[in-house]
């Protein structure tokens, strides 16, 4: 079957790159889900030209099931529905060269290798923004904007909710 997906060279101007945290929040019940889901929905419909690395979906499954206590079947169903859209926003490539560049950025900025990969993608596609909930990344990277697309008041509610959820029972 021939897919009608856009090849990276045909994408044109890319607004931004989407980090794993946004994907996570959009795929399980929480106070910020509606906002994260709405944001991803626009991207998957290609109304906003942002790229979501497919590897972010894999990372989201790990975070959801291992750290947030989301049932594995629920995480699987939610994330596979997103992948099954086969949206041109889903970026599939991790080459050896991209991994090398990602590690170089990680070393240079003293950040995680994943964040180095996001910087690599932003530079590769000349995207001026990384959409992320990682405020530490925003402090360290100056030439690319790091923006949380979830409104601050909603994100504050999410953080409070997540702290309570992850707090051990006395």
Q: How should these model regions be labeled?
A:
Residues 20, 112-129, 136:
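Acidic, metal-associated active-site segment
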Residues 21, 54, 96, 134-135:
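Alpha-helix N-cap/helix-start capping motif
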Residues 25-27, 63, 140:
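Residues that scaffold the ATP/ADP-binding catalytic core of kinase and kinase-like folds
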Residues 37-51, 55-108, 120, 158, ...:
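PIN-domain endoribonuclease scaffold, especially VapC-family toxins
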Residues 130, 146-153:
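Short hydrophobic/aromatic-enriched beta-strand-loop microsegments
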Residues 136-137, 150-159:
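Short, acidic/turn-prone active-site loops that include or flank metal/cofactor-
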Residues 137-144:
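Short loop/helix-cap segments at secondary-structure boundaries that form the rim of catalytic
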């Amino acid at each position: 079957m021939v897919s009608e997906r856009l090849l990276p060279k045909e994408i044109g101007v890319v607004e931004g790159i989407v980090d794993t945290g946004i994907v996570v929040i959009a795929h399980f019940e929480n106070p910020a889900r509606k906002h994260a889901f709405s944001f991803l929905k626009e991207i998957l419909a290609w109304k906003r030209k942002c790229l979501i690395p497919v590897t972010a979906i894999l990372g989201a499954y790990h975070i959801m099931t291992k750290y947030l206590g989301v049932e594995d079947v629920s995480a699987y169903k939610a994330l596979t529905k997103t992948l099954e859209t086969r949206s041109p926003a889903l970026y599939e490539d991790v080459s050896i060269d991209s991994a090398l560049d990602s590690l170089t950025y990680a070393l240079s900025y003293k950040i995680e290798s994943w964040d180095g990969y996001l910087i690599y993608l932003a530079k590769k596609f000349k995207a001026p923004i990384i959409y992320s909930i990682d405020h530490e990344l925003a402090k360290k990277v100056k030439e690319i904007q790091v923006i949380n697309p979830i409104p601050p008041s909603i994100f504050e509610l999410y953080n409070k909710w997540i702290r309570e959820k992850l707090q051990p029972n006395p």
